[in-house]
Amino acid sequence: EFYRSKLFDVSLSRLGSFKLRTLLVLAQKRLKSLDQDCPNDSFHKIRIELKKVRYAYEFLSEIFYFDGLKKYEERLKDMQEIFGALQDYDVWLGILERLPEVAGKEKLESKIYKQIYKTREEILKKRLKFIKATRKISRNLKIYYI
């Protein structure tokens, strides 16, 4: 069936740029909606979106030729690491909540919450520059399939 479809004759650069741009636009929209009131689950969902973007980006970036690709890859990795750190703190908090009451547990929970809020602030601080960089890459990808 694939060989008879319209996609059979589409170049990898055209198909790849469309897919990657779709992922970028979705991530960009979700990042815009983030704020201090969002639950950690919203941040986690964006982390998963960024992971998809990164894998597609790493797989397809060699077929595109325009300025800023390498720099964006570094920014993408940085954002993904920050989102990953937030998820790690959230997991540690969940583990700690399941443990029986022991001396120092509340103090440790307090430290983890502090790290969660610091990490969330860092994400919110960096997201606008990241959205701007994402928009630029997205526009450059668009030329491959229009």
Q: Which positions does each model-derived feature cover?
A:
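Cationic, histidine-enriched alpha-helical/coil surfaces that engage anionic ligands
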Residues: 1-146
